[in-house]
Amino acid sequence: MQEQYRPEEIESKVQLHWDEKRTFEVTEDESKEKYYCLSMLPYPSGRLHMGHVRNYTIGDVIARYQRMLGKNVLQPIGWDAFGLPAEGAAVKNNTAPAPWTYDNIAYMKNQLKMLGFGYDWSRELATCTPEYYRWEQKFFTELYKKGLVYKKTSAVNWCPNDQTVLANEQVIDGCCWRCDTKVERKEIPQWFIKITAYADELLNDLDKLDHWPDTVKTMQRNWIGRSEGVEITFNVNDYDNTLTVYTTRPDTFMGCTYLAVAAGHPLAQKAAENNPELAAFIDECRNTKVAEAEMATMEKKGVDTGFKAVHPLTGEEIPVWAANFVLMEYGTGAVMAVPGHDQRDYEFASKYGLNIKPVILAADGSEPDLSQQALTEKGVLFNSGEFNGLDHEAAFNAIADKLTAMGVGERKVNYRLRDWGVSRQRYWGAPIPMVTLEDGTVMPTPDDQLPVILPEDVVMDGITSPIKADPEWAKTTVNGMPALRETDTFDTFMESSWYYARYTCPEYKEGMLDSEAANYWLPVDIYIGGIEHAIMHLLYFRFFHKLMRDAGMVNSDEPAKQLLCQGMVLADAFYYVGENGERNWVSPVDAIVERDEKGRIVKAKDAAGHELVYTGMSKMSKSKNNGIDPQVMVERYGADTVRLFMMFASPADMTLEWQESGVEGANRFLKRVWKLVYEHTAKGDVAALNVDALTEDQKALRRDVHKTIAKVTDDIGRRQTFNTAIAAIMELMNKLAKAPTDGEQDRALMQEALQAVVRMLNPFTPHICFTLWQELKGEGDIDNAPWPVADEKAMVEDSTLVVVQVNGKVRAKITVPVDATEEQVRERAGQEHLVAKYLDGVTVRKVIYVPGKLLNLVVG
């Protein structure tokens, strides 16, 4: 064994061994308990970033630990390879998205191997290959035949820069999440999957997910947004149709003083024919941002349509306004307004001088003061005719029942959730497998024409999708008739909604999934990824699992038992102000800093001498140029050091602050472990451990070893507090470094302790542990070694600490044998100088003894 720890030598050697032995390749084995550990698959952007490294290190630690418990562990990896960035990069680099993507995959695969992650590479998949997306296309055609897919024209968020549709969640402050361009509204035909048909199940089954973070479940609950209410129909004077609204507060219905419709509503369109002001307003609304977060904060505007609706219960005529806060795609495109008891309606009514009628009493029973704001709390009705005096629930039911009896109301359950629009007007995605015949019939692409292959050898102009620009690509024949293929491609969330299941049978040629393999491995035991995916990917992931279950492919209801959302990785951020007042962000690697005595940064400059402004720690990002390249760190310190720092610096679900001093600390610790093993093995062979022949000191050290095993096992396995597990191993190492190594049993005990330490560290730092295990003559490879088991007998304390009080005041703490009697404890206490001092010349009137804990002598 060499004296110095040289990670660059051992890591590549160990990685080669894993590759040659195919150590982490697994197959279904009914005789073993399975464990499926999955990290969210990466987008092949070109290089790994620290967020990836953190995510995949957590997964690898869990997978290696479960493997050491004797389980059949599947940990696969693949590439979420379709998507918009590839198109931009292709244009910029004068290439096509496919070669750019495949080059990135090759590069990032090497980076993953360099970090020592124990993946089953035989299951690697890339979602941009026809071998993968053909099954997604086939499944889509089957969903269409089941009535779960439809096409409709809908108003969408359109990014003029990316030339694509954005989901509501992808619009941030009215701008595209990716390029910050102002989003427009546009009507285009799109394909939808009926996720709303599964809304109730998606909502109710959240209760089955005991090991998912509450924050994620709450976000999904709110996103699905189930509500119970009443749909009410209004007659409208001089208009051919009725207006239907949905309300969750029918108890306030007697206070409804106006209706509001979306600018795109047929009633508003009709009114605009003779109303130039309204026509201009409708035009303005067409380009209004539509994401709900913006709806809440934007200025509420409207125009009177001139139409009057008739209140079904009072017979009063109430005005109908077109308003920018009502959306056609939400509910019926019309809402009833109760300005006395809804703040948005109140602000709108106040702005335009509309009637405000209070119908709910304040909590103290008085009429509410509506001079400043609406009263939004529930309460007792007044000013409501026959419903006066009813509380919220009674009024809800009474008004709902009356409207139903009159034939103008119906109780309804509504959802905020909208069907999933899966059409994208981009090139680099899976083609949607639908065709339009000459006679206008739309139908699924026949099975014998699947997959519809996306051509990869294309020229990108940065504006039009190559398959839209090439009229020949769309031409095909179905049943002898000329037909045109759909030129839209799938939303890339389609591919990432079922990849976890395909990992169970990546080579399967007969269909989307081999049910036998899928049902052996699924559900995923732990899924690891960022909380930013809570309402998009993680909802579609659950939805797709239910679709596959209903197609008979899987027999579980949910795709993953546990979800672990890792925290973000932060780093210092610095900038200087350029000549034009712009901020130039400088990498923390290039910042020369001065710190105060507490280690805080007080001054910074770069190599060119610019005075830098320090903005604190923020998420590693390209925009702030504060990303740290994992490859540079691995080359400098070794993969094991980077992994250890990642797991030690912070709990897995909290933010992690990147500090190179912390990385250096992790490196020093591994050098200490190496040194201790080197010194131990240099002394030659070791005798067998004889636990009956150990001295008190040796027993105490062995007790520490086994208590550490018990703690680390609990921290990794049950609590998943990996940082405290590492801290416990470090504490034990400090004790081992000071332990005597001269006697035969000292060395035998050290051998047991070091073999335990190396196995406990193995999930975190597998390369060094692989090597040290061989040096310690462990049986076989450490990859197949069992996790150490704590010896209960070794953990039993021989002695205990007893607090000695005189008249309730602590005077001493004494160590006594565990089985000491009260008399022996009193005798031992009397030998303590501080106790004897207070007993001198006084009578002990009473003795209070709590065995093994407390002795209180009451004297007088």
Swiss-Prot record:
Pfam families: Anticodon_1, tRNA-synt_1, tRNA-synt_1_2, tRNA-synt_1g. GO terms for molecular function: aminoacyl-tRNA deacylase activity; ATP binding; leucine-tRNA ligase activity. GO terms for biological process: leucyl-tRNA aminoacylation. ATP binds at residue 653. Keywords: Aminoacyl-tRNA synthetase, ATP-binding, Cytoplasm, Ligase, Nucleotide-binding, Protein biosynthesis. The keyword ATP-binding applies. The keyword Coiled coil does not apply. A motif ('KMSKS' region) lies at residues 650-654. PANTHER family: LEUCINE--TRNA LIGASE, MITOCHONDRIAL, LEUCYL-TRNA SYNTHETASE. This is Leucine--tRNA ligase.
